[in-house]
């Protein structure tokens, strides 16, 4: 499979020499197609060359222009920055610098440009979690109108928006596309397929718990499996039943805002997000654009029984079933720990880790066999006792091209050309083999991924399945993602230290979100900052009033640990493939 992963030195050198001339060049395009794409595309060679010729022609007015774009540092964006950006420059004559910085820094730069009006970057790869922010502030170019109007002459005829599997996540309530997906990855369940199929393990589990060891459908089963494996000896070493992280830092925030509460069953039914209450516990009534509160006393669910249950289970499992030291790990430390090979399962695992988890044993990965085939699989996330059919069941990250209105039109056009180049049908299949962050349906179904699927632990099967729509990013109920997201890690981080109980922490979190939203309401009423779609908080009422109403917030269950339920992984995949 090396042919899918290798970026050749010859290609880099060829493009480097051509880019110094900074002129549009079909010769450079052919070199790129020969050496880098090398037939790995959903398009025929003739169609690839036609796309490249279109880019050359469309870029002519901007030849020699220098533009800057920015994204977070993940494998997909490293490939864009190091390989695709130089290729684009060589082919079009537009000099593009693609900066790689931390995810939080991307948001900070974006906020700086939104607040100052100065053009910091010509385009951003920004999480679609900010769709509610962008739709309300109206400071980003709405791409639907852009493609039909000012940007029509630089919009790729073969872009095919309907081919993007995440375009619903980047569409506002007004039906307009605000961001163009560049990479996306889901948060799924990860487990040791080999251990789950071991006959002594299966027999011992069945004898103890009364049902089959398999992929947990429910959190009850996940907890039983975590308990079962923790302390068990496999291949001469002690193993653990769970992996997670708990360090009080910003990465702990998205551990929860990335739909952990909805996995437990917090919020209402609705795809891609619950209505009227979403997974953050923020209520926004149907047919309106004004959030009315996060606290149960205002009709929200951020501190309701389902949310508190979700935080309590995170804390308990981290203490009882994870390897020593996991509670002090941050997001970035948890992956290397998993590759040691002493953990049975992880309930909250990003598919962006796939590229690292299929590395060979020689690179320190103890979760593959000697041939490099994964000993693990990924599967749908289990759900908690408050979950109901029709609710989202997990999170999907969609990093998307975002162009602000404060960027001058000519620079926006040049940046739009680059954005389309790196997601084009010519390029996307090869890019997806490098980063494994699918954005196009045509790519997911390409024959090269059918061939590679056995080496990817279930990634291809998941993205080809109809279930993928139940994993979605943060939605439009969240009026200002940067302002509200930072509250989460600061409050929940105090649970694992023992400073606050889960209920106390979520009460504080919900109250602080309401305080911040009340300030947004004042700004919107005074100066139309959110276009009239800022919060309009409900008056507080007795919590029992809201808990007795249908839907979220949901009243506390008498039994939060019903009998566990599992499913056989191979049968699950077979259902997907029918």
Residue ranges and their predicted role:
Residues 86-163, 198-200, 204-206, 344-345, ...:
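Extracytoplasmic "Venus flytrap"/periplasmic binding protein-like
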Residues 221-227, 265-328, 372, 381:
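Glycine-centered hinge/linker elements that transmit conformational signals in sensory
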């Amino acid at each position: 499979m090396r042919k899918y992963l290798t970026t050749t030195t010859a290609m880099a050198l060829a493009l480097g020499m051509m880019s110094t001339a900074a002129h549009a060049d079909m010769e450079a395009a052919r070199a790129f197609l020969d050496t880098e794409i090398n037939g790995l595309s959903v398009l025929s060679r003739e169609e690839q060359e036609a796309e490249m010729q279109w880019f050359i022609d469309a870029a002519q007015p901007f030849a020699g222009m220098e533009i800057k774009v920015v994204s977070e540092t993940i494998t997909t964006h490293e490939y864009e920055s190091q390989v695709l950006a130089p290729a684009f420059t060589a082919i079009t004559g537009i000099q593009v610098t693609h900066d790689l910085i931390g995810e939080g820094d991307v948001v900070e730069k974006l906020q700086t440009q939104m607040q100052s009006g100065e053009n910091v970057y010509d385009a951003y790869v920004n999480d679609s979690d900010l769709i509610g922010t962008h739709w309300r502030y109206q400071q980003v170019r709405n791409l639907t109108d852009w493609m039909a109007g000012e940007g029509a002459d630089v919009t790729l005829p073969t872009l095919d928006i309907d081919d993007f599997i995440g375009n619903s996540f980047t569409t506002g309530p007004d039906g307009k596309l605000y961001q163009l997906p560049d990479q996306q990855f889901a948060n799924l369940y990860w487990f040791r397929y080999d251990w789950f199929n071991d006959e002594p393990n299966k027999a011992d589990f069945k004898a103890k718990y009364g049902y089959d060891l398999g992929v947990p459908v429910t959190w009850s089963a996940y907890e039983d499996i975590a308990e079962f494996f923790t302390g068990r000896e496999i291949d001469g070493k002690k193993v653990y039943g769970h992996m997670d992280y708990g360090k009080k830092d910003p990465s702990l925030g998205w551990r929860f805002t990335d739909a952990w509460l909805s996995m437990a069953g917090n919020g209402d039914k609705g795809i891609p997000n619950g209505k009227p209450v979403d997974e953050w516990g923020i209520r926004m009534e149907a047919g309106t654009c004004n959030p009315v509160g996060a606290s149960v006393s205002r009709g929200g669910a951020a501190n309701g029984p389902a949310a508190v249950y979700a935080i309590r289970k995170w804390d308990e499992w981290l203490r009882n079933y994870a390897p020593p030291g996991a509670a002090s790990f941050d997001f970035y430390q948890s992956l290397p720990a998993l590759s040691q090979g002493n953990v049975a399962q992880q309930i909250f695992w990003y598919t962006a880790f796939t590229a690292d988890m299929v590395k060979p044993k020689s690179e320190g990965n103890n979760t593959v066999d000697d041939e490099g085939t994964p000993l693990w699989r990924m599967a749908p996330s289990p759900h908690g006792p408050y979950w109901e059919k029709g609710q989202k069941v997990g999170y999907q990250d969609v990093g998307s091209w975002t162009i602000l209105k404060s960027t001058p039109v000519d620079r926006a056009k040049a940046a739009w050309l680059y954005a389309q180049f790196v997601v084009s049908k010519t390029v996307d299949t090869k890019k997806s083999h490098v980063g494994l962050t699918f954005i196009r349906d045509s790519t997911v179904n390409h024959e090269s991924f059918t061939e590679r699927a056995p080496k990817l632990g279930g990634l291809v099967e998941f993205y080809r399945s109809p279930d993928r729509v139940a994993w979605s990013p943060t939605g439009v109920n969240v009026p200002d993602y940067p302002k509200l997201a930072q509250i989460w890690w600061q409050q929940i981080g105090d649970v694992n230290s023992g400073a606050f109980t889960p209920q106390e922490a979520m009460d504080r979190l919900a109250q602080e979100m309401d305080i911040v939203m009340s300030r947004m309401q004042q700004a919107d009423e005074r100066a139309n900052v959110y276009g009239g779609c800022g919060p309009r908080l409900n008056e507080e009422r007795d919590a029992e009033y809201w808990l007795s109403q249908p839907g979220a917030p949901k009243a506390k269950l008498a039994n939060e640990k019903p009998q566990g339920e599992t499913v056989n992984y191979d049968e699950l995949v077979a259902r997907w493939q029918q």
